[in-house]
Amino acid sequence: MSETSYLTDPRVMETVLRRLDELESREAITGLMVDYMAATDAKEDKGIKVARLFTEDGSWESVGPHGNPGWAATGHEALIKKFDRNVARMPFSAHFVTNPAIDLDGDVARGRFMYFQACTYRGDQPLWIAGSYDNDFRRVDGKWLISYMRVHNFFTTPFDQGWVKVPHMDTP
């Protein structure tokens, strides 16, 4: 097969387009999780910012030995309520997401991520929180959204001399 015919072969183009879609989908899903982290750290309109990242029927659930079934939420209205009540509980939070592992199957995907969070609980209690996400994603009208988020909390632990008592430490 000549180079010219190879480049114009529809099978080659189909393979290239499929691979491009996979790369773009992985990047979009990773970006979606970064957007989720930023939304959960928002001081205003937190619930709306989080809910818009989920499908209309999207669910959030806390699972595992440290899970809290009372925090489960399904649908935009429930997600907004759930995340808006976090503003008073945690007036400061900084979420970080790492280690994406994404499996794609057309317009659905499964993604696993690790997270770390520094936060202030109930006004003056500094905490470290870490865990993982095991999420289902669905592409709706060309946009990837979270359809089911499972949050597995590894630990929530006080940090005795955290950012509340020492807001900034010089590190020359």
Model-derived features: positions:
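Short, low-complexity N-terminal intrinsically disordered segments enriched in polar/charged residues
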Residues: 1-42, 46-48, 52, 56
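A beta-strand edge to alpha-helix "cap/lid" segment located at domain peripheries
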Residues: 2-17, 88-172
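A solvent-exposed, acidic/Ser-Thr-rich amphipathic alpha-helical stretch
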Residues: 46-115
